[in-house]
Amino acid sequence: QTKFWQTGMIECGVKYGLSSTNNHMTTDSIFNDIPLSQTPQDFRYDEHVAAAYISVGKQFGEHWSVKLGLRGEYTYSFGNWLSADSVTRRSYFNPFPTAYIGYTTSPLGNLQQPIAVSASYTRRIKRPNYWMLNPFRTYVDAYSYQEGNTALTPEFNNDVELHFSWTQYLNVTFNFAHTQDMFSQKTTILPDGMGYTKWINFGTCTTHGGNLSLTELPLVPKYVTAEDGTKTMQGAWLALTVNAGWFHFINKSYEKNAEGKSAYENRTHYGYVGGTLSAYLPKDWTLTFDGNWSSPMTTGYNKQGSMYFLSFGVRKMYMPKGLIFNLNIQDLARSLSMVDKSEGMAPGYESWHENYVRQQRVMLSITWMFGQYQQHKNRKVGNMDELNRLGGGGGVQTGN
């Protein structure tokens, strides 16, 4: 990176990533201690991603800032899916532009900005997780199974945001996004009644909506009296943090009906709200109460049910000794459950499952700070994108 015209900055860089998976696995079917069959799961998958980017930013006066950027990515992938007796090769290049313009009523660099407004545009790529590509068949029960899709291609997202902030407390964001080749799982009913679920590039998803967040808004301010008798606010006895949003979804499948229109189209709404109420008591005691709720949401062929979650925490600090005691109680109402339903199936069929996640727990932690504290900034570079695509298990999974 280099500066120009005092307040301008040019940055450029390159990145190369290689991921290679060589999987050998055999699944044994056993009934009454008698081996029935062996199913191999052998494949080799290599992916090369080469990228280069350049961005130019400039401050104009004390209130305006502009930034433009462009990233180009070339991808080559090879998959030898031995168990499925198929080979896939892909080679493609994609540009990803970005643009940003911002205005503040106070000089740039002032942390106590009274009002700030910005607008941005970004284009992103999301490659399928490796387990989405794995064609290995996983049986859910005697009448259904699921598998990956070696022909799955990346999805692309175009996002436009208008952001407004007031001091350090209030942030409001209006968002419009359009996703192409969106990932979704589709359940198909076979003539024998067996159902199978497979990852596909569903189609497009268009969303628009907004988000509002309040950060540590003082409900009961704490005042400090100076020697001359003047009072100034310093923190709060009771503070509220809230994050809420509402979005409208339009899902359209690439699959067409006899009239040439999308065979499946769904228009739904989605909303969520979460908040934390913090009480800062004398002698460094802190009480927190957290609550989160989200409405049902439909993306592609998949519909998720609503859920809510409650937690409570107590913290005690002994600053002279550098000791911090934390007691947290999660899922107070034992309410955390997830309901998923498959849409767009054959008439007369429906598929849904409910998963109860037992997250109710009590955690006690003790932190002792000593010596000189130094904050280290971790920069995410290299293979972070590839690691995220491995899934929670840290390796290639056979299902979702």
Q: What is the predicted role of each segment?
A:
Residues 1-80, 106-110, 207-245:
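Face-selective signature of the C-terminal outer-membrane beta-barrel domain
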Residues 5-10, 63-66, 106-111, 115-117, ...:
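Repeated loop/turn-to-beta-strand initiation elements of outer-membrane beta-barrel proteins
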Residues 202-292:
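Gram-negative outer-membrane beta-barrel transporters
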Residues 41-45, 125-178, 197-220, 353, ...:
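Outer-membrane beta-barrel signature, preferentially recognizing the C-terminal barrel domain
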Residues 47-87, 91-102, 108-159, 174-196, 241-246, 272-296, 330-347:
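Surface-exposed extracellular loop regions of Gram-negative outer-membrane beta-barrel proteins
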Residues 318-400:
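C-terminal beta-signal and adjacent terminal beta-strands/loops
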Residues 16-22, 72-78, 103-105, 121-127, ...:
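Transmembrane beta-strands of outer-membrane beta-barrel pores
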